[in-house]
Amino acid sequence: MTDLLHKLNFKIADASPEYKQRRKIQMIRFFTASAVTIFASRFAYRATVSRQYIPTLFQGNHSPPLSYNFTTDAAVAVGTGTLLCGSVTGMTVFGLCWILDVSNIQEFGWRMKSMLGGWESEKKLSEAPMDEESSYIQDSLNDILDGKYDFEEDTEEVHTAEMKTK
């Protein structure tokens, strides 16, 4: 198989076995979601056709038969719609993950950040000068995290200030 891929000049021929396995798993997920979508659409089609009301020659076509159950019909419609929506969404998500070579949420975040220019924006923002108030807050938080700030001393000062105001 690799010889054929080299002969046809495919880049995946030079890829590692781990990469090929990863792409294979992504492909299997997409095709599984596609198969579920096909089965769900066939189920929805059959559910719709079985509930179709076909009147006889002299019956009106505007009123359903007396044995018709609206509650069951509504429940089947909601369930079928939810099944179709979920399966199409899964197929779309797995298809995009296969195209973008993404296997988990963290990789999706990295990929979107790189595609939308997030790395450059973050670099520019980190190089920007910080204003005085933000610098003071950052230094205070760092002091608290480093254990340099004494909370007991601060509460004594607050109590002393409260006593003076009373």
From Swiss-Prot:
Coiled coil: none annotated. Its main location: membrane. The chain crosses the membrane at residues 27-49, 78-100. It is found in: Membrane. It is a multi-pass membrane protein. Keywords: Membrane, Transmembrane, Transmembrane helix. GO terms for cellular component: membrane; mitochondrion. PANTHER family: ALTERED INHERITANCE OF MITOCHONDRIA PROTEIN 11. Belongs to the AIM11 family. This is Altered inheritance of mitochondria protein 11. It comes from Candida dubliniensis (strain CD36 / ATCC MYA-646 / CBS 7987 / NCPF 3949 / NRRL Y-17841). The lineage of its organism: Eukaryota, Fungi, Dikarya, Ascomycota, Saccharomycotina.
